[in-house]
């Protein structure tokens, strides 16, 4: 395989970095009136302004050269054609098949997967229609008013994010609840809000053996039966997203209400699959299909557009520039829309679980940085929390500012204030404020010279802080589909360039294995096992505390 450090463009970019690292965006804008026009892209209902980055035409040219040398176009084609690019698990990677609205064949191991994708989608639609229309009745012949999704990781983060983002499109009768944490308090809080007669539980676990999910599911089942009494009532109030038909049936769920997905769908890429059943229940089949349409639009742009005008590719390459050359170890997601407040958490899993890897596809140490730490918060709240660090801290931290052009509320003045802040922050991060500008401002306030000079260093902003401004014309299912697909493909492209597998997650496994051993010790089912002195002490502290 091609190793990043051996690519000619990798070295050329280091030389270019040495020559260009002192350039300031403020001056680049002053010298080039067409800068914003050149570094601007529109795809469907999304607009990307990437002009406020530490880049020029040479930077982008060399980054595109790097992408070609790393084999990005070929790897993209392999994914779309069903090749087993998840080499450590010997699996295809085909979340794009789930939103393949052209229905053109996508073949894995000699089988076109589209018929079974469409079959599950149709079954989801029929089930959602029954629940939403009120024809699906609980054990007391009442309609469903609450849906509780029990899952973890990709079985939770994606559906929760999308249902929250698209709340204005949700069914007015349905209240959506999501349970992922096994600590008990989250499930207890949800159960205190719902009624067994009108609640539908969705248990989302591919194997139906995930410890956290099954623990919560069994507790929910016990709570339900304490009220319903009759085991047969479970079938009216529980559905499953799984491939383990036997375990689902043993749980008491009617397998007619089991919705499958496949090993070529990774958890963090699965909201388009049956894992998205809560989304379809809440938004309806038509809006779910619109979400798929938006993702498909981005897929087609991604696979058919030259790298030089390819939105996910450009975002990926700019990220590479900061991570591998500037040493930017983190990346902020700041949506300026309260309904998008779950988006940073979703992208955090997407990026960090995909690209938080230390070895290349051939098992060698990477020798360079990979995934940054992804974090964030809604933009307005962030401005009053951590934007101080972004403006005047010592780290180079790229920021994605995400907003909608169309108002989401009829409250006068709110949206204009919101967008004014988005645009102002992007400008402030780029321009900064020079010492002379600070002096002039303070002098105009009548401040004496000595006090001015004391304050100048504190009120100066260096600027040159990078941002991507991502605008949706409106927040709707189609544009949300495009937005999430864009981030998926960005993550994939960065993984290609780093030479890593973006589609496994072996780092999740070690802690699970050790937890099984320790659980036996905490419950008394097994004797003491050999651990380090710290872990032994922690186990003993728990046992002593709970003997009292």
Curated annotation (Swiss-Prot):
Pathway the protein takes part in: Carbohydrate biosynthesis; gluconeogenesis; Carbohydrate degradation; glycolysis; D-glyceraldehyde 3-phosphate and glycerone phosphate from D-glucose: step 2/4
Annotated active site: 353 (proton donor), 384, 512
GO cellular component: cytosol
Documented EC number(s): 5.3.1.9
UniProt keyword annotations, A-Z: Cytoplasm, Gluconeogenesis, Glycolysis, Isomerase
Top EC class, one word: isomerase
Main location class: cytoplasm
Localization per record: Cytoplasm
GO biological process: gluconeogenesis; glucose 6-phosphate metabolic process; glycolytic process
Cystine pairings recorded for this chain: none
Recorded family membership: Belongs to the GPI family.
Function: Catalyzes the reversible isomerization of glucose-6-phosphate to fructose-6-phosphate.
Protein name: Glucose-6-phosphate isomerase 1
Organism for this UniProt entry: Neisseria meningitidis serogroup A / serotype 4A (strain DSM 15465 / Z2491)
Upper taxonomic lineage: Bacteria, Pseudomonadati, Pseudomonadota, Betaproteobacteria, Neisseriales
């Amino acid at each position: 395989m091609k190793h990043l450090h051996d690519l000619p463009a990798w070295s050329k970019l280091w030389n270019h970095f040495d020559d260009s690292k002192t350039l300031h965006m403020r001056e680049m804008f002053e010298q080039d009136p067409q800068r914003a026009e050149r570094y601007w892209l529109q795809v469907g209902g999304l607009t990307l302004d990437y002009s406020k980055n530490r880049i020029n035409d040479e930077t982008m040219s060399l980054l595109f050269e790097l992408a070609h040398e790393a084999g990005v176009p070929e790897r993209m084609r392999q994914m779309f054609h069903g090749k087993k690019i998840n080499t450590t698990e010997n699996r295809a990677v085909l979340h794009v098949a789930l939103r393949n609205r052209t229905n053109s064949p996508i073949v894995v191991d000699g089988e076109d997967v589209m018929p079974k994708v469409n079959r599950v989608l149709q079954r989801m639609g029929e089930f959602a229609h029954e629940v939403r229309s009120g024809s699906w009745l609980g054990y007391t012949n009442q309609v469903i008013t609450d849906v509780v999704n029990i899952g973890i990781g990709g079985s939770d983060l994606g559906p929760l994010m999308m249902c929250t983002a698209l709340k204005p499109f949700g069914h007015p009768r349905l209240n959506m609840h999501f349970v992922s944490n096994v600590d008990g308090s989250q499930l207890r809080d949800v159960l205190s809000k719902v009624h067994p007669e009108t609640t539908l539980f969705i248990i989302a676990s591919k194997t139906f053996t995930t410890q956290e999910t099954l623990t919560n599911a069994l507790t929910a089942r016990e709570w339900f039966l304490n009220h319903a009494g009759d085991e047969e009532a479970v079938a009216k109030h529980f559905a499953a997203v799984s491939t383990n038909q036997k375990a689902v049936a043993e749980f008491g769920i009617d397998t007619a209400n089991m919705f499958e997905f496949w090993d070529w769908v990774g958890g963090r890429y699965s909201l388009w699959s049956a894992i998205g059943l809560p989304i379809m229940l809440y938004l309806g089949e038509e809006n779910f299909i619109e979400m798929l349409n938006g993702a498909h639009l981005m897929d087609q742009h991604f696979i058919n557009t030259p790298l030089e005008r390819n939105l996910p590719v450009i975002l990926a390459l700019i990220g590479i520039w900061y991570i591998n050359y500037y040493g930017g170890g983190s990346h902020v997601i700041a949506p300026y829309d309260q309904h998008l407040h779950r988006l940073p958490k979703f992208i955090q899993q997407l990026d960090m679980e995909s690209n938080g890897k230390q070895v290349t596809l051939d098992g060698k140490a990477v020798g360079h940085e990979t995934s940054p730490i992804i974090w964030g918060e809604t933009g307005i709240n962030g401005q009053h929390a951590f934007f101080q660090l972004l403006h005047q801290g010592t780290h180079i931290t790229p920021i994605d500012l995400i907003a909608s052009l169309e108002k989401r509320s009829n409250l006068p003045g709110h949206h204009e204030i919101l967008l004014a802040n988005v645009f102002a922050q992007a400008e402030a991060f780029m321009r900064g404020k020079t010492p002379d500008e600070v002096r002039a401002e303070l002098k105009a306030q009548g401040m004496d010279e000595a006090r001015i000079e004391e304050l100048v260093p504190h009120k100066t902003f260096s600027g040159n802080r990078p941002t991507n401004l991502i605008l949706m014309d409106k927040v709707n299912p189609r544009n949300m589909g495009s937005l999430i697909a864009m981030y998926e493909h960005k993550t994939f492209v960065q993984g290609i360039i780093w030479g890593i597998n973006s589609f496994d997650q072996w780092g999740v496994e070690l802690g699970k294995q050790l937890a099984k051993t320790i659980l036996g010790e905490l419950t008394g089912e097994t004797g003491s096992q050999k651990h380090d002195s710290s872990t032994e002490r922690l186990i003993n502290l728990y046992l002593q505390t709970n003997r009292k």
